[in-house]
């Protein structure tokens, strides 16, 4: 497929003149006014205009620029009020916050200071590939089988999907133009020739599912280190951003449609889960939580809330446990074999300052940056809410809120500790780690004297 693409759409080099990019609010009129201000300043220095004349024009221009900025960002916040990503981009732009990608000149790793980009790339690759295994190795062995926590009997199995050329072409057209793959393949070319590419991809996908195999060429991820905060020579202060091939995204999107339909139609997903689901959002989760808190306060009861955070939850998913849970929920046969192969023998490499590291094998976690990863994680964590008998739970993917209500605060605390112990045992069994540094509790009460 890649050879066919390269022969049909060879890369050609063309030199173009790139104009300097300006802020969106910077109009041609404002640019002319800025030049006019600079000229007035020179004239003031030469004594041909008064300081008052220059000052009046400078203040006038400052007001124009301030108004232009206000109008620009007001337009953004109005047009994209339902698009949180765009809103935060605008906020970060206003604050001057930008992600630092590969800006560091050196890296401290294993008591050494690395300066060569190729060495830094290898260090990032080793660091990112060892985070999850190190977390997993610190967990003690638990004798409880994960299947003991599973509820329900699912005798019927998920049907093996068969897609048409139209289905594949529709998926291709729906792909985000801003998200490219890792093989120098132009998404715009594929989208403009969607039906041409859909024909072989339809055959390949149907054969892939029927044989229970996922193409090995689609299992490699490119990792880019993105600086979060803190010293930029510490690898702990970087977030790995993963990119997969465009064809992998097409295959995964096709499978995701069938998988979600099956999970939702069979009511498999826990109703307390609000993450990555149709017609569910953080607003709904917050609404449920708020109503329960207000209802308890009206009864003069107290509410103890525990906000639980997992350490690298998506990256530490145990593949064998996940596959067994999928089998329990009716995902069997060639489809289950397809998911097994999808998770097996995945590779990743890191790119820093144009230098590519060697590849490393990934044996834990759902693939980062993938289409299927979030849905697979929902399956993995699906049985967690059935643990609790005294506490209510609200989940948004890996973020869990437990809360207990009642008139007696001491009893609430006792019940909460009991529920947390059950959660601890579940985590040991399912190889997940609670991040105690980011796990908090909050007490809602009208009582004057607290516990």
Positions of predicted regions on the chain:
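Basic/polar low-complexity segments
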Residues: 3-23, 46-163
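Secondary-structure edge/capping motif, primarily at the C-terminal ends of alpha-helices
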Residues: 37-48, 404
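A glycine-rich phosphate-binding loop feature that marks nucleotide/adenosyl-phosphate handling sites
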Residues: 78-81, 145, 222, 435-447
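Conserved pre-catalytic core of RNA-dependent polymerases
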Residues: 128, 154-366
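Short, conserved micro-motifs composed of acidic
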Residues: 158, 354, 418, 433-451
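Catalytic palm active-site di-aspartate
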Residues: 181, 220-223, 239, 273, ...
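Active-site palm subdomain of RNA-directed nucleic acid polymerases
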Residues: 255-273, 298, 374-404
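Catalytic palm subdomain of template-directed nucleic-acid polymerases
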Residues: 312-329, 401-425
């Amino acid at each position: 497929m890649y050879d066919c693409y390269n022969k049909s759409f060879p890369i050609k080099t063309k030199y173009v003149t790139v104009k300097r990019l300006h802020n969106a609010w910077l109009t041609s009129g404002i640019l002319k006014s800025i030049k006019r201000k600079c000229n007035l300043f020179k004239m003031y220095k030469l004594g041909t205009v008064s300081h008052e004349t220059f000052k009046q024009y400078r203040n006038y221009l400052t007001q124009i620029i301030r108004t232009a900025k206000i109008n620009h960002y007001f337009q953004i916040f109005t047009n994209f009020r339902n698009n949180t990503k765009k809103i935060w981009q605008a906020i970060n732009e206003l604050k001057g916050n930008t992600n630092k990608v590969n800006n560091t000149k050196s890296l401290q790793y294993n008591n050494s200071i690395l300066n060569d980009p190729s060495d830094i790339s290898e260090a990032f690759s080793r660091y990112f590939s060892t985070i999850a295994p190190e977390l997993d190795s610190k967990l003690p062995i638990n004798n409880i089988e994960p299947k003991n926590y599973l509820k329900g009997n699912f005798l019927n199995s998920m049907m093996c999907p068969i897609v048409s050329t139209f289905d594949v072409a529709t998926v291709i057209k729906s792909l985000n133009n801003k998200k490219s793959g890792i093989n120098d393949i132009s998404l715009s070319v594929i989208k403009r020739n969607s039906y041409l590419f859909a024909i072989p991809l339809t055959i390949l996908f149907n054969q892939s599912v029927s044989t229970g195999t996922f193409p090995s060429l689609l299992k490699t991820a490119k990792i880019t280190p993105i600086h979060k905060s803190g010293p930029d020579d510490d690898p702990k202060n970087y977030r790995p951003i993963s990119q997969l091939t465009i064809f992998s995204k097409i295959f995964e999107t096709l499978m995701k449609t069938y998988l979600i339909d099956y999970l939702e139609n069979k009511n498999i997903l826990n109703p307390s889960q609000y993450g990555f689901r149709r017609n569910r959002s953080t607003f709904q989760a917050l609404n449920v939580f708020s109503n329960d808190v207000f209802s308890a306060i009206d009864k003069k009861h107290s509410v103890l809330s525990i906000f639980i955070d997992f350490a690298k939850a998506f990256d530490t998913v145990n593949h064998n446990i996940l596959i067994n849970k999928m089998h329990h929920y009716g995902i069997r046969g060639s489809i289950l074999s397809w998911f097994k192969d999808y998770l097996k023998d995945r590779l990743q490499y890191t790119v820093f300052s144009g230098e590519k590291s060697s590849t490393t094998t990934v044996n834990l976690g759902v693939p980062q940056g993938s289409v299927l990863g979030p849905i697979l994680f929902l399956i993995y964590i699906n049985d967690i809410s059935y643990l609790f008998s005294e506490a209510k739970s609200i989940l948004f993917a890996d973020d869990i809120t437990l809360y207990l209500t009642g008139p007696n605060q001491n009893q609430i605390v006792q019940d909460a500790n009991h529920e947390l112990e059950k959660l601890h045992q579940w985590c040991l069994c399912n190889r997940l780690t609670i991040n105690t540094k980011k796990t908090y509790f909050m007490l809602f009460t009208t009582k004057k004297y607290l516990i």
